[in-house]
Protein backbone atom coordinates (compact mmCIF):
# COMPACT_ATOMS: atom_id res chain seq x y z
CA UNK A 1 0.00 0.00 0.00
CA UNK A 2 0.92 3.64 -0.06
CA UNK A 3 2.04 5.70 2.90
CA UNK A 4 -1.02 6.88 4.79
CA UNK A 5 -1.55 10.31 6.24
CA UNK A 6 -1.61 9.76 10.03
CA UNK A 7 -4.49 12.23 10.29
CA UNK A 8 -6.58 10.10 7.94
CA UNK A 9 -6.33 6.52 9.06
CA UNK A 10 -9.25 5.12 7.13
CA UNK A 11 -10.02 4.41 3.52
CA UNK A 12 -12.29 6.86 1.67
CA UNK A 13 -14.84 6.25 -1.06
CA UNK A 14 -15.81 9.31 -3.11
CA UNK A 15 -18.65 9.44 -5.62
CA UNK A 16 -18.66 12.15 -8.31
CA UNK A 17 -22.16 12.60 -9.63
CA UNK A 18 -24.11 15.00 -11.77
CA UNK A 19 -26.28 15.24 -14.84
CA UNK A 20 -25.19 14.01 -18.24
CA UNK A 21 -22.95 16.59 -19.96
CA UNK A 22 -21.91 18.43 -16.79
CA UNK A 23 -18.23 17.50 -17.20
CA UNK A 24 -17.69 14.54 -14.87
CA UNK A 25 -15.27 12.88 -17.30
CA UNK A 26 -13.33 16.13 -17.81
CA UNK A 27 -12.98 16.63 -14.04
CA UNK A 28 -11.85 13.03 -13.51
CA UNK A 29 -9.37 13.33 -16.38
CA UNK A 30 -7.87 16.47 -14.83
CA UNK A 31 -7.64 14.74 -11.44
CA UNK A 32 -5.77 11.83 -13.09
CA UNK A 33 -3.43 14.21 -14.95
CA UNK A 34 -2.63 15.97 -11.67
CA UNK A 35 -1.62 12.63 -10.15
CA UNK A 36 -4.13 12.53 -7.33
CA UNK A 37 -3.50 9.37 -5.26
CA UNK A 38 -6.86 7.78 -6.03
CA UNK A 39 -8.12 4.67 -7.75
CA UNK A 40 -10.39 5.86 -10.57
CA UNK A 41 -13.08 3.26 -11.18
CA UNK A 42 -14.11 2.32 -14.69
CA UNK A 43 -17.86 1.88 -15.13
CA UNK A 44 -19.31 -1.06 -17.04
CA UNK A 45 -22.00 -0.37 -19.65
CA UNK A 46 -24.03 -1.93 -22.43
CA UNK A 47 -24.23 1.29 -24.43
CA UNK A 48 -22.35 1.51 -27.74
CA UNK A 49 -18.75 2.66 -27.59
CA UNK A 50 -18.22 6.22 -28.88
CA UNK A 51 -15.44 6.99 -31.36
CA UNK A 52 -13.05 8.55 -28.84
CA UNK A 53 -13.60 5.96 -26.08
CA UNK A 54 -11.22 3.14 -25.14
CA UNK A 55 -12.61 -0.11 -23.72
CA UNK A 56 -11.24 -0.63 -20.20
CA UNK A 57 -10.18 3.02 -19.89
CA UNK A 58 -13.34 5.07 -20.41
CA UNK A 59 -15.80 2.22 -19.79
CA UNK A 60 -15.92 -1.56 -19.86
CA UNK A 61 -18.25 -2.29 -22.79
CA UNK A 62 -20.38 -5.44 -22.44
CA UNK A 63 -23.25 -7.07 -24.30
CA UNK A 64 -26.62 -7.29 -22.53
CA UNK A 65 -26.07 -11.00 -21.84
CA UNK A 66 -22.56 -10.44 -20.41
CA UNK A 67 -23.86 -7.65 -18.16
CA UNK A 68 -26.81 -9.78 -17.01
CA UNK A 69 -24.44 -12.63 -16.09
CA UNK A 70 -22.34 -10.20 -14.03
CA UNK A 71 -25.48 -9.02 -12.23
CA UNK A 72 -26.36 -12.64 -11.38
CA UNK A 73 -22.83 -13.01 -9.97
CA UNK A 74 -23.41 -9.89 -7.80
CA UNK A 75 -20.37 -8.29 -9.49
CA UNK A 76 -21.57 -4.68 -9.16
CA UNK A 77 -21.49 -2.26 -6.24
CA UNK A 78 -24.45 -0.60 -7.95
CA UNK A 79 -26.12 -0.87 -11.33
CA UNK A 80 -28.96 0.87 -13.10
CA UNK A 81 -30.63 1.35 -16.44
CA UNK A 82 -29.95 4.86 -17.72
CA UNK A 83 -31.27 6.13 -21.06
CA UNK A 84 -32.04 2.54 -22.07
CA UNK A 85 -28.58 1.09 -21.33
CA UNK A 86 -27.22 -0.74 -18.31
CA UNK A 87 -24.45 0.82 -16.23
CA UNK A 88 -22.68 -0.65 -13.23
CA UNK A 89 -19.69 -0.14 -10.94
CA UNK A 90 -17.69 -3.40 -10.75
CA UNK A 91 -16.98 -4.40 -7.13
CA UNK A 92 -13.65 -6.14 -7.79
CA UNK A 93 -11.42 -3.11 -8.48
CA UNK A 94 -13.07 -1.11 -5.65
CA UNK A 95 -12.41 -3.92 -3.16
CA UNK A 96 -8.81 -4.34 -4.37
CA UNK A 97 -8.10 -0.63 -3.91
CA UNK A 98 -9.73 -0.67 -0.46
CA UNK A 99 -7.63 -3.67 0.58
CA UNK A 100 -4.50 -1.76 -0.50
CA UNK A 101 -5.58 1.38 1.39
CA UNK A 102 -6.04 3.39 -1.82
CA UNK A 103 -8.92 5.87 -1.77
CA UNK A 104 -11.45 5.37 -4.58
CA UNK A 105 -13.49 7.75 -6.71
CA UNK A 106 -16.52 6.50 -8.62
CA UNK A 107 -18.40 8.32 -11.37
CA UNK A 108 -22.14 7.75 -11.08
CA UNK A 109 -25.40 9.44 -11.93
CA UNK A 110 -27.57 10.79 -9.09
CA UNK A 111 -29.53 7.53 -8.90
CA UNK A 112 -26.26 5.57 -8.70
CA UNK A 113 -24.89 7.85 -5.99
CA UNK A 114 -27.98 7.17 -3.87
CA UNK A 115 -27.57 3.41 -4.39
CA UNK A 116 -23.90 3.58 -3.41
CA UNK A 117 -24.83 5.51 -0.25
CA UNK A 118 -27.12 2.60 0.68
CA UNK A 119 -24.32 0.05 0.13
CA UNK A 120 -21.53 2.23 1.56
CA UNK A 121 -22.90 4.80 4.04
CA UNK A 122 -19.38 6.19 4.59
CA UNK A 123 -19.12 7.32 0.94
CA UNK A 124 -18.61 11.04 0.32
CA UNK A 125 -21.08 12.12 -2.38
CA UNK A 126 -20.16 15.09 -4.58
CA UNK A 127 -22.51 16.51 -7.20
CA UNK A 128 -21.09 18.44 -10.14
CA UNK A 129 -23.54 20.99 -11.53
CA UNK A 130 -23.62 23.21 -14.61
CA UNK A 131 -23.79 26.98 -14.12
CA UNK A 132 -27.30 26.86 -15.62
CA UNK A 133 -29.56 24.76 -17.87
CA UNK A 134 -28.82 26.72 -21.09
CA UNK A 135 -25.10 26.00 -20.60
CA UNK A 136 -25.79 22.30 -20.01
CA UNK A 137 -27.95 22.23 -23.14
CA UNK A 138 -25.08 23.77 -25.14
CA UNK A 139 -22.59 21.20 -23.81
CA UNK A 140 -24.85 18.27 -24.62
CA UNK A 141 -25.61 19.63 -28.10
CA UNK A 142 -21.87 20.07 -28.79
CA UNK A 143 -21.27 16.37 -28.12
CA UNK A 144 -23.52 15.56 -31.08
CA UNK A 145 -24.34 12.14 -29.60
CA UNK A 146 -28.10 12.62 -29.14
CA UNK A 147 -31.09 13.22 -31.37
CA UNK A 148 -33.19 16.31 -30.68
CA UNK A 149 -35.73 14.21 -28.75
CA UNK A 150 -33.02 12.44 -26.74
CA UNK A 151 -31.46 15.82 -25.92
CA UNK A 152 -34.80 17.07 -24.55
CA UNK A 153 -35.07 13.95 -22.37
CA UNK A 154 -31.53 14.45 -21.03
CA UNK A 155 -32.26 18.10 -20.16
CA UNK A 156 -35.49 17.19 -18.36
CA UNK A 157 -33.64 14.44 -16.49
CA UNK A 158 -30.82 16.87 -15.61
CA UNK A 159 -33.31 19.31 -14.09
CA UNK A 160 -34.71 16.53 -11.86
CA UNK A 161 -31.20 15.33 -10.99
CA UNK A 162 -30.14 18.81 -9.91
CA UNK A 163 -32.98 18.86 -7.38
CA UNK A 164 -31.93 15.41 -6.10
CA UNK A 165 -28.25 16.40 -6.18
CA UNK A 166 -28.90 19.11 -3.62
CA UNK A 167 -29.29 16.26 -1.08
CA UNK A 168 -25.71 15.02 -1.59
CA UNK A 169 -22.77 15.93 0.66
CA UNK A 170 -21.06 18.55 -1.52
CA UNK A 171 -22.09 20.65 -4.54
CA UNK A 172 -19.55 21.97 -7.07
CA UNK A 173 -20.42 24.18 -10.06
CA UNK A 174 -18.43 23.38 -13.21
CA UNK A 175 -18.13 26.79 -14.87
CA UNK A 176 -16.86 27.25 -18.43
CA UNK A 177 -13.11 27.68 -18.62
CA UNK A 178 -12.75 27.14 -14.86
CA UNK A 179 -11.97 23.42 -14.69
CA UNK A 180 -8.73 24.00 -12.81
What are these regions (language model features)?
Residues 104-109, 119-142:
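Conserved phosphate-donor/acceptor-positioning beta-strand/loop module used by diverse small-molecule
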Residues 2-3, 7, 138, 145-146, ...:
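NTP-dependent small-molecule kinase module
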Residues 22:
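ATP-binding Walker
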Residues 17-19:
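P-loop (Walker A) phosphate-binding loop of NTP-binding proteins
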Residues 13-15:
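Short hydrophobic/aromatic beta-strand immediately N-terminal to the Walker A/P-loop
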Residues 25:
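Walker A/P-loop
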Residues 43-104, 110-111:
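ATP-dependent small-molecule kinase phosphotransfer cores
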Residues 32-41:
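Post-Walker A helix-loop "phosphate-sensing" segment adjacent to the P-loop in P-loop NTPases
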Amino acid sequence: GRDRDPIRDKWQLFVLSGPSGVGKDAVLSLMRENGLPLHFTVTATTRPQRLNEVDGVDYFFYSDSEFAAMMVDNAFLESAIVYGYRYGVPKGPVNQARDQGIDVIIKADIQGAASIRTEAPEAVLIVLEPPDIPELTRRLAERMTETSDALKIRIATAQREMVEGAKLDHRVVNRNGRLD
